[in-house]
């Protein structure tokens, strides 16, 4: 047991830690965690504080895209669910949804976000609702549902725009809005918004957020089949070691798109080097989807003979893990490959799997 005074003090420290995470104050987040970890013996003596700490530890890892030990951490937390009040249950489901997003399983993420929304009334913080709406919007974007994604991101943006101190959240919402414009083929509007975001982010000196903006602008150019322009932005991200370390999953998405653009523009040596780095990193951080996508590109662009058997194996693996959005573009690339070989039977086979 610990005294009420110490319990209140520890609770305030934990909430300050979570608030810093919500505002993406990365350095402050790490400083607060170090400070809190010094009090772990006290925190472990109080069940509610210990559950809260473990939940926020999961959020901390997700912020830095670190999946190490998260499966066992969440298993343990679900075993304590009957001891949680509605506030802690909200965090449990919300963070579970975020974990599914890191694993690129948006359908499962939405399931958890909807359960979290049932407990939203227990959270006396408007910004928590905004964060939930934003993350739900992100899941719908990955599910190729722009209308629902835009609806949710605008709800989040409305909350953030009316409060001081959430400029980075406003920017992340606008980034998500812009990538939805890409899906809606509103390319000029997307580019204009990306460039506004880059200018603002440069003023904030937030390298992590800036890398996200550069990547997305590169993705727009790749979508427009302007691969040389796309590479100008992708290379800015690839050379940022801090982004690679702190946001490895996002970095890997850029690696994949870079490899694709490099092969298409004939930069074979660079493509192979980036691809090898991507395979090693995706195995290290255990991102199966990106690993399979990179192996597919490798088979498609470097095989001396017909890579049909390899391609089929990777496509079936991606289907098994329901990576439908990822498959969509890959299948187009594979189909185009066989069309150029005048093998229309195989081209038709792969396009029908889309």
From Swiss-Prot:
Protein's UniProt keywords contain Cytoplasm: yes
Mapped TPR repeat ranges: 64-105, 107-126, 130-163, 171-204, 211-244, 321-353
A cellular-component GO term for this protein: cytoplasm
Chain coiled-coil ranges: none
SUPFAM superfamilies: TPR-like
Gene name for this UniProt entry: rapD
Entries under Gene3D superfamilies matching the protein: Tetratricopeptide repeat domain
Family assignment from sequence similarity: Belongs to the Rap family.
The protein's name: Regulatory protein RapD
Keywords: Cytoplasm, Repeat, TPR repeat
Keyword Protease listed: no
InterPro entries xrefs: TPR-like_helical_dom_sf, TPR_rpt
Subcellular location(s) per record: Cytoplasm
Transmembrane segments: none
């Amino acid at each position: 047991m610990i005294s009420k005074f110490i319990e209140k003090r520890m609770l305030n420290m934990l909430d300050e830690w979570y608030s810093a995470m919500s505002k993406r104050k990365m350095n402050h987040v790490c400083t607060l965690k170090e400070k809190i970890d010094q009090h772990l013996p006290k925190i472990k003596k109080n069940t509610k504080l210990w559950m809260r700490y473990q939940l926020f530890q999961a959020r901390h890892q997700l912020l830095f895209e670190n999946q190490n030990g998260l499966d066992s951490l969440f298993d343990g937390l679900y075993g304590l669910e009957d001891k949680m009040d509605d506030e802690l249950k909200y965090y449990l489901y919300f963070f579970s949804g975020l974990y599914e997003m890191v694993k690129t399983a948006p359908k499962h993420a939405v399931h958890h976000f909807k359960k979290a929304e049932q407990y939203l009334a227990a959270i006396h913080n408007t910004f928590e609702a905004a964060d939930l709406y934003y993350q739900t919007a992100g899941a719908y974007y990955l599910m190729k549902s722009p209308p629902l994604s835009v609806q949710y991101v605008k709800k989040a943006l409305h909350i953030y725009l009316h409060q001081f101190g959430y400029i980075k959240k406003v920017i992340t919402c606008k980034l998500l809005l812009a990538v939805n414009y890409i899906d809606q083929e509103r390319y000029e509007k997307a580019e204009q918004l990306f460039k506004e975001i880059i200018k603002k982010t440069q003023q904030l000196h937030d390298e992590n957020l800036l890398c996200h903006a550069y990547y997305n602008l590169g993705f727009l150019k790749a979508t427009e089949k302007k691969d040389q322009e796309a590479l100008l932005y992708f290379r800015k991200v690839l050379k940022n070691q801090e982004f690679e370390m702190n946001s490895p999953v996002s970095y890997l998405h850029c690696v994949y798109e870079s490899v694709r653009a490099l092969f298409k523009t004939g930069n074979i040596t660079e493509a192979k080097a980036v691809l090898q780095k991507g395979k090693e990193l995706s195995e290290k951080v255990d991102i199966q989807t990106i690993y399979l996508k990179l192996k597919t590109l490798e088979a498609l662009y470097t095989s001396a003979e017909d890579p049909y058997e390899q391609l089929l194996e990777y496509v079936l693996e991606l289907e098994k893990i329901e990576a439908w959005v990822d498959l969509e573009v890959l299948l187009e690339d594979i189909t185009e490959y066989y069309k150029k070989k005048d093998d229309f039977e195989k081209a038709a086979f792969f396009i029908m799997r889309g």
